[in-house]
């Protein structure tokens, strides 16, 4: 099988981001958990939807430093991986991650986090700094370090804090540019400011400011907040005992996947929150505080001062981003949210400084930094222990300009850009009235990891607001000329919250400053795309990313209606809103700010007291449906009487419900609108707290009484600064407001189990106007110009009778202002249909909201009491369903069943004998080799066709089901933004790659089985052919001797047949009559030719005879001539001898020849040479010569044999053997005695005669039996004769042995036959038996031993004739 689908998925991710990076992720697509869970899901969209619900990609990253995080965020998007799989992997990785986080502690990670059902976390680094700003930040911002004691919560050494002005303040352009890439719904990675000291709280409780902090007349520039608050350090010791007691009572359900710092954990003790050094923070602060009658804190610019009390805030955010760009290489890890959050009974926002080691909080959110910013000054007159930190926007700091209200409209439009929902507030020409009392941290650039699975505890005892403080706070609000920008909630109620355990909502953002456990237990489900999480710089940046709303356009509230902005009205209102580039054309989020400038520059808010509310934190409105859902949820999640096993089961149920919330995409989500402020005094920061976060599928809270204002929000701040209003819209005094708030405080404790909210520090609530004040404001409610198709579809999909709830937050590095708009119960609230985007006049923040009302008109009142109760599970908007094929075309997924390819071209050269007819051999070979394969292929093709048919039927059924009921993935993909679609397409591409590789693996496995079958058949064929080859070789060995002759006969017959066929064809071409006449003439000619041929042959014979005769005569003439010449020579030589003398010598020689029997051949001085006269061996010529030497009578016998050309080879061989033996046997040396010589010559002559008879006998044998063989050795001559006995059908071999001694010594004829040995051997016979062999042997022996001449041939003939 090819490469794991995992490498293809990584390569796909690299293609998306434009880089090549081979880095493996532990939970990438293709892991064992993902594969198993993917197989279990029958719905194709199930599991995919979980991954795409809240993830987004930063499309504006440009630096190399962003690559790791972008690659991680895409590659770690897991489809359907369960929590236990991630937990197992987490345990193996987090130990190294903790060490890495400590080693890289000097890194400021401004990242944005988003949650999905499986609790994944994403980092979104920001890199939008110019070179000049980077250099300014790096050189002009020194570090600040704080030393603290972890045990006593008191600083050990001096703190070096440098507050200086930023040389170049950030403009709205820098804010918007820095946050273009931030599109997620949660942000928890940036610094959170902690409070300065408990001394401030004690001073405020006492009713007067600390003398060391607030001089009456002079401006104070605090360079070291730690020295400025010496007494505040001691106040922290009081809360140690309380903290330890609370921790003993709490059940800390820790996630064991990572080490947790129990003693000084960030989540366990809110006072452990620390700020970072100035090199890490985006803002450097210079504070000037003075006491004025209105107890008001103002933000002032170093160059422009509009009031004696000012706080200067210089933006070094781009410097911080420069540092992030170089440092931001941390890898993302999984977050396991399988444990509930333990909410403490008591909470105090006053933090203490910690050491560097204590500030490292090992929590299970993928190594994010919780960076804290310093607080430089506090004011008196407010109980800071009841102030709780707001959710903070950790993405950008605040650039404040206190002279915004004094500028002309033309000056404000120069720096206008689009709103950025993820950016911090850019506050100009306004004064912050509430400051967040957060203490700076002693850590510098240290990474903190927050674990949402840990309980939150606090050691500070609750401190409640009294009526004097509330009256003073209300008085300050009425006299303030600066806008309120913080959503603050009370930290604790008037009485302790019962200790109980809650199950956290993993899809819900976490409140950093430890809200009450019971309040968190009643939280509503959060919409995934509208989740708000604590943001940077301790600011509540409420980003509600709505999938069907426009994020880039803000809206305004006029009365109870929402109005879209226009360019001319925006310039007329002199608003400056930070730009925010829309990341997608589908995700449009409506947002607005809760401040608008009045023409005279005073921004005031009107608050209304609620007699039914006894707590300032009663800012969240609730509907009866919310009460019912809260009551059911409280009964479901309450753990006061449950055992530990029940708690675990409920935890798992919470995880499942959260995943359901993500998968179902509840579009009926409503967000609460909360406007609430804190009391502002000289040197005080405003603390921002998010009022409520909703999960998907939550039911909106209804208010007991509606908030009303007499004028729209455009003029709302001015009137609020003049006088707060009562429930009926009439102005009331500060005393009335204070009395109303005290009642609210008491009522909050009683209703804390019914209304689900996060407690914040508020003193009054803002009433929304029920009717717009003028027609111009009504006209601005229209949505025709700004609501896009996605927003309208989303608005139409919402259920009717839902109250508009908007949550507003603003962030600043070190001081925050939150203003909330509340809706009380049991009163109708007017909603405007189709509202998508409305701008506000003050560029303070961009708030995401949902305005969901389909049935009601633009200004139609919807009674709360008539609201229907909604189910816990949401319903999808009414959109036109699409088919599966259309969705697959949208995602680029295609099936391969309709592909057609051309036939493979022929790559071999054409054969010259293409039309040659196949022989039988070729046909048989093809049959035995290919036929089994063809059968197997036929079967395989049928199986494949069946599989394909089944697959098509299955796909058809799926198409019918999906068309009948579209999966949620179809809707989400069509409504997704371009960036989300890129991410989803990358996931689809990985799924396609995985499916393709898996299908290829299945195909190879199936094909392997097919090939095994083919191999088996081929092996069987090979075995059979090998057996046949062996048999054929055996047969060929037998037939081979006769094959050649048969082949020659066959070829001759073929030639004859062909010739006859040609003749027949030739004869058929002519007429038969003419042919007959021609044949007659031909016969006559043949006869004549034959006659003449005979005559010619006769003449030729005659000629030859005459030629022979002529030749003989010629030879005779030649001989005569030679003889004549010889005679003449002889005569010439012997002419001296007399004739008589010569005649006498001739007579003597003749007499000697007659006596000896030898002819004298020659006479020499040395001896004489004699030759025998026997010529009986005709046609052989064997002449025996004897040379007698004269000296010692040495006789050398030599036989000169001459054989004719046609002689028998066997006889010649016998004669040669006999002659050689005879010469050796008779060559002797005699003494000088002629008698002995004469006798010896006689014996030689007789012996030679015997040998002549023997040779003639050999010739007779050869004539009858040609296969005669003769062998000779030193003692005998062996003759082998093969006889075929026809009567007995057998063949015998007769062996004669003639002894040489007897042959050469016998002088009698035939005597040597008596000593001849005879043997008979049977060669083959039809029947077994030795009877005839013995008979043959006896017959041969008798004939040989009794015959004198020709005994051998006579004996063989006798036997042959006998058995013939």
From Swiss-Prot:
GO BP of this protein: attachment of mitotic spindle microtubules to kinetochore; cell division; deactivation of mitotic spindle assembly checkpoint; homologous chromosome orientation in meiotic metaphase I; meiotic centromeric cohesion protection in anaphase I; mitotic sister chromatid biorientation; mitotic spindle assembly checkpoint signaling; positive regulation of meiosis I spindle assembly checkpoint
The record lists the membrane-crossing segments as none
Which Pfam families did the record assign? Knl1_RWD_C, Spc7
Q: Which domain of life is it from?
A: Eukaryota
Phosphothreonine: which positions carry it? Answer: 257, 453, 507
Q: Name one GO molecular function term.
A: kinetochore adaptor activity
Keywords, A to Z, come to: Cell cycle, Cell division, Centromere, Chromosome, Coiled coil, Kinetochore, Meiosis, Mitosis, Nucleus, Phosphoprotein
What's the protein name?
Outer kinetochore KNL1 complex subunit spc7
Q: What is the lineage of its organism?
A: Eukaryota, Fungi, Dikarya, Ascomycota, Taphrinomycotina
- UniProt lists the gene as spc7
């Amino acid at each position: 099988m090819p490469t794991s689908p995992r490498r293809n998925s990584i390569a796909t991710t690299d293609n998306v981001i434009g880089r090549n990076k081979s880095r493996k992720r532990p939970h990438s697509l293709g892991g064992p958990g993902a594969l198993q869970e993917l197989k279990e899901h029958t719905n194709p969209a199930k599991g995919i939807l979980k991954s795409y619900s809240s993830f987004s990609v930063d499309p504006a990253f440009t630096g190399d430093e962003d690559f790791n995080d972008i690659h991680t965020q895409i590659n770690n998007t897991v489809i359907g991986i369960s929590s236990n799989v991630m937990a197992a992997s987490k345990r193996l990785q987090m130990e190294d991650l903790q060490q890495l986080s400590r080693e890289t502690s000097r890194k400021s990670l401004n990242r944005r986090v988003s949650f999905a059902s499986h609790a994944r976390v994403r980092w979104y680094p920001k890199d939008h700094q110019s070179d000049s700003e980077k250099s300014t930040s790096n050189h002009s911002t020194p570090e600040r370090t704080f030393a603290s004691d972890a045990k006593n919560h008191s600083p050990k050494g001096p703190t070096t804090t440098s507050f200086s002005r930023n040389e170049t303040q950030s403009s709205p352009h820098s804010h918007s540019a820095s946050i273009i890439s931030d599109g997620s719904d949660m942000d928890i990675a940036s610094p959170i400011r902690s409070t300065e000291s408990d001394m401030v709280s004690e001073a405020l409780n006492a009713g007067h400011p600390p003398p060391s902090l607030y001089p009456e007349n002079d401006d104070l520039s605090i360079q070291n907040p730690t020295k400025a608050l010496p007494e505040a350090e001691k106040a922290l010791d009081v809360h140690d005992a309380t903290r330890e007691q609370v921790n003993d009572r709490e059940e800390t359900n820790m996630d064991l996947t990572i080490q947790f710092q129990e003693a000084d954990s960030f989540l366990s003790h809110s006072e452990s929150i620390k700020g970072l050094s100035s090199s890490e923070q985006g803002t450097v602060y210079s504070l000037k505080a003075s006491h004025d009658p209105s107890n008001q804190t103002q933000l002032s610019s170093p160059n422009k001062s509009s009031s004696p009390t000012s706080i200067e805030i210089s933006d070094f955010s781009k410097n911080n981003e420069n540092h992030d760009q170089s440092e931001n290489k941390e890898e993302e890890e999984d977050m396991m949210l399988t444990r509930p959050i333990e909410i403490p009974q008591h909470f105090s926002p006053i933090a203490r400084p910690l050491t560097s080691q204590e500030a490292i909080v090992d929590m299970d959110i993928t190594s994010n930094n919780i960076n804290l910013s310093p607080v430089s000054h506090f004011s008196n007159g407010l109980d800071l222990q009841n102030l709780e930190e707001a959710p903070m926007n950790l993405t950008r700091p605040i650039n404040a300009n206190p002279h915004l209200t004094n500028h002309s409209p033309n000056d404000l439009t120069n720096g206008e850009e689009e709103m950025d929902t993820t950016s911090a507030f850019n506050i100009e020409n306004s004064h912050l009235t509430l400051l967040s009392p957060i203490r700076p941290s002693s850590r510098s650039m240290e990474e903190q990891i927050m674990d949402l699975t840990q309980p939150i505890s606090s050691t500070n005892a609750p401190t409640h607001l009294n009526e004097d403080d509330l009256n003073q706070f209300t008085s300050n609000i009425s006299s303030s000329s600066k806008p309120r920008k913080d959503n603050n909630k009370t930290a604790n109620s008037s009485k302790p919250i019962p200790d109980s355990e809650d199950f956290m909502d993993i899809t819900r953002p976490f409140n950093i400053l430890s809200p009450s456990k019971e309040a968190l237990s009643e939280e509503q489900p959060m919409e995934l795309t509208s989740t708000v999480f604590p943001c940077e710089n301790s600011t509540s940046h409420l980003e509600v990313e709505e999938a069907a709303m426009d994020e880039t356009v803000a809206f305004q509230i006029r009365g109870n209606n929402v109005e879209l902005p226009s360019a001319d009205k925006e310039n007329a209102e002199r608003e400056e809103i930070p730009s925010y580039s829309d990341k997608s054309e589908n995700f449009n989020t409506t947002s607005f700010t809760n401040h608008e400038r009045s023409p005279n520059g005073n921004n005031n808010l009107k608050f209304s007291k609620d007699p039914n509310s006894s707590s300032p934190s009663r800012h969240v409105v609730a509907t009866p449906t919310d009460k019912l859902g809260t009551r059911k949820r409280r009964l479901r999640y309450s753990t006061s009487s449950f055992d530990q096993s029940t708690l675990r089961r409920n935890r798992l149920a919470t995880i499942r419900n959260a995943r359901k919330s993500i998968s179902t995409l509840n579009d009926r989500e409503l967000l609460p609108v909360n406007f609430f402020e804190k009391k502002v005094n000289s040197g005080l920061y405003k603390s921002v707290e998010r009022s409520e976060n909703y999960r998907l599928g939550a039911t909106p809270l209804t208010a007991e009484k509606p908030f009303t204002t007499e004028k729209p929000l455009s003029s709302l701040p001015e009137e609020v600064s003049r006088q707060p209003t009562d429930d009926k819209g009439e102005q009331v005094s500060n005393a009335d407001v204070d009395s109303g708030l005290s009642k609210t405080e008491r009522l909050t404790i009683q209703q804390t189990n019914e209304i689900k909210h996060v407690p914040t520090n508020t003193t009054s609530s803002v009433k929304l106007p029920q009717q717009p004040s003028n027609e111009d404001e009504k006209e601005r409610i229209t949505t025709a110009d700004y609501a896009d198709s996605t927003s309208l579809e989303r608005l139409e999909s919402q259920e009717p009778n839902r109250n508009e709830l908007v949550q507003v937050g603003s962030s600043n590095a070190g001081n925050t202002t939150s203003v909330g708009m509340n809706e009380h119960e049991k009163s109708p609230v007017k909603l405007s249909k189709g509202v998508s985007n409305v701008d506000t006049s003050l560029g303070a923040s961009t708030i995401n909201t949902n305005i969901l009302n389909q049935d009601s008109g633009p200004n139609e009142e919807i009674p709360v009491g008539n609201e229907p109760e909604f189910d816990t599970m949401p319903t999808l908007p009414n959109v036109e369903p699409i088919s599966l094929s259309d969705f697959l075309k949208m995602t680029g997924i295609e099936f391969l069943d309709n592909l057609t390819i051309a036939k493979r071209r022929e790559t071999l050269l054409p054969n010259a004998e293409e039309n040659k007819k196949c022989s039988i051999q070729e046909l048989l070979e093809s049959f035995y080799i290919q036929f089994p394969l063809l059968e197997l292929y036929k079967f395989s093709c049928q199986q494949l066709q069946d599989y394909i048919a089944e697959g098509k039927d299955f796909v058809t059924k799926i198409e019918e089901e999906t068309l009948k009921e579209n999966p949620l993935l179809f809707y989400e993909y069509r409504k997704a933004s371009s960036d989300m679609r890129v991410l989803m397409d990358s996931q689809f591409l990985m799924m396609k790659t995985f499916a393709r590789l898996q299908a290829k693996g299945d195909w190879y496995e199936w094909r392997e089985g097919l090939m095994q079958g083919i191999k088996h058949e081929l092996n069987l064929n090979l075995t059979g052919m090998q057996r046949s080859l062996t048999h054929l070789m055996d047969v060929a060995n037998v037939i081979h001797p006769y094959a050649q002759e048969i082949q020659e006969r066959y070829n001759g017959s073929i030639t004859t047949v062909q010739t006859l066929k040609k003749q027949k064809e030739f004869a058929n071409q002519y007429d038969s009559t003419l042919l007959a006449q021609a044949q007659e003439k031909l016969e006559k000619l043949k006869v004549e030719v034959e006659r003449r041929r005979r005559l010619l042959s006769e003449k030729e014979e005659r000629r030859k005879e005459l030629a022979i005769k002529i030749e003989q005569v010629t030879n005779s003439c030649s001989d005569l001539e030679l003889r004549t010449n010889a005679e003449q020579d002889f005569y010439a030589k012997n002419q001296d001898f007399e004739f008589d003398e010569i005649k006498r010598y001739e007579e003597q020689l003749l007499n000697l020849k007659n006596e000896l029997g030898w002819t004298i051949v020659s006479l020499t001085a040395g001896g004489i040479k004699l030759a025998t006269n026997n010529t009986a061996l005709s046609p052989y010529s064997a002449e025996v010569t004897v040379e007698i030497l004269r000296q010692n009578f040495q006789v050398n016998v030599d036989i000169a044999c001459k054989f004719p050309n046609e002689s028998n080879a066997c006889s010649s061989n016998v004669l040669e053997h006999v002659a050689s033996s005879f010469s050796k046997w008779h060559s002797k040396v005699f003494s000088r005695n002629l008698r002995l010589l004469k006798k010896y010559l006689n014996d030689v002559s007789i012996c030679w005669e015997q040998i002549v008879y023997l040779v003639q006998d050999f010739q007779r044998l050869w004539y009858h039996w040609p296969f005669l063989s003769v062998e000779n050795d030193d003692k005998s001559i062996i003759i082998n004769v093969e006889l075929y006995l026809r009567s007995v059908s057998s063949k015998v071999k007769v062996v004669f042995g003639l002894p040489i001694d007897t042959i050469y010594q016998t002088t009698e004829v035939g005597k040597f036959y008596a000593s001849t040995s005879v043997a008979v051997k049977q060669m083959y016979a039809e029947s077994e038996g030795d009877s005839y062999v013995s008979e043959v042997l006896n017959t041969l022996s008798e004939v040989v031993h009794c015959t004198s001449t020709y005994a051998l041939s006579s004996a063989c003939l006798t036997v042959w004739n006998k058995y013939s």
